Design a protein with these regions (language model features):
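Short amphipathic alpha helix immediately N-terminal
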Residues: 50-66
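N-terminal interaction/assembly modules
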Residues: 1-49, 69-70, 75, 79-81, ...
Length: 105
């Protein structure tokens, strides 16, 4: 069973890997295949589960390492509202992640 903190870690790995890969299209030797697989899983499976585009943007910006003030400004919310949306979205994604992993075993 994953926690929201674990899911946030998956998103962080995906965002950082995506930044490294998008610079020139090739896979640098220091990027692990597991990180690329995590990025693909997050982008292809978890991100589409976030129906609210603003919530999706908040999660992705925060995963890239932006501070709450920058995230809030980018999406037009206060910092506390952005944090609330982020936490709520991670809880929802955690439930989805745990459901798909239980059904696979």
């Amino acid at each position: 069973m994953k926690t929201p903190k674990d899911i946030a870690g998956l998103f962080k790995t995906a965002a950082q890997t995506e930044l490294l890969l998008s610079q020139d299209g090739s896979v640098p030797p220091f990027v692990l295949p597991e990180d690329v697989a995590t990025m693909r899983f997050v982008i292809d499976t978890l991100m589409p589960q976030i129906a609210d585009l603003r919530a999706r943007r908040i999660v992705w910006l925060r995963s890239q390492g932006l501070c709450w003030k920058s995230v809030a400004k980018e999406v037009g919310l206060t910092e506390s509202q952005a944090k609330r949306v982020f936490c709520k979205t991670l809880r929802e994604i955690t439930v989805f992640y745990n459901q798909i992993n239980v059904s696979e075993t």
